[in-house]
């Protein structure tokens, strides 16, 4: 069994935005919400063995905030996670065989596109009840029933939980069984 966590960056700061999206920082609200999600995650006593994160300023800051609470030892910046497709995330994960649990800190719509690839439509409907997208600072956990990441597909994936910054959505445990 492998475990994948998706963490969307904290709410970005639009004040003084100069058109350089890559360099936008996190707002104070984004900092607090990211801390809130990290504290909820800490209570679960789960271990993240590898963190892959986008090169954007807000993603790096989200990692720093999360890491102060969670202590992730193995972190790798992936420049292509910024403005990537869901297919890129899927292929990136397939190359990570040494680890049991991976956290990806990234962006929308990349995460929604990735979920469309990895989770069948019945599970996606349950996620969409939370909104049309993954909100900033939200954390999703997916259990993937494979022995190596190279074997991931749409089968036997279970959406375990979705932690939103303002509330804990809870255990979902909806299994993906679509071919």
Located regions from the model:
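Domain-level recognition of soluble alpha/beta enzyme cores
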Residues: 119, 123-160
């Amino acid at each position: 069994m492998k475990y994948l966590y998706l963490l969307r960056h904290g709410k970005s700061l639009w004040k003084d935005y100069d058109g350089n999206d890559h360099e936008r920082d996190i707002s104070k609200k984004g900092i607090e919400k990211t801390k809130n999600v990290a504290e909820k995650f800490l209570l679960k006593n789960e271990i993240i063995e590898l963190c892959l994160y986008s090169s954007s300023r807000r993603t790096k800051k989200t990692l720093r905030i999360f890491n102060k609470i969670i202590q992730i030892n193995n972190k790798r910046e992936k420049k292509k996670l910024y403005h990537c497709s869901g297919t890129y995330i899927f292929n990136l994960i397939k190359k990570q065989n040494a680890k049991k649990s991976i956290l990806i800190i990234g962006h929308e719509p990349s995460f929604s596109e990735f979920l469309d690839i990895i989770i069948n439509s019945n599970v996606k409907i349950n996620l969409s009840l939370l909104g049309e997208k993954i909100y900033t600072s939200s954390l999703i956990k997916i259990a993937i029933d494979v022995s190596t990441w190279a074997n991931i597909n749409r089968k036997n994936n279970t959406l375990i939980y979705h932690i939103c910054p303002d509330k804990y959505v809870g255990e979902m445990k909806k299994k993906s069984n679509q071919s």
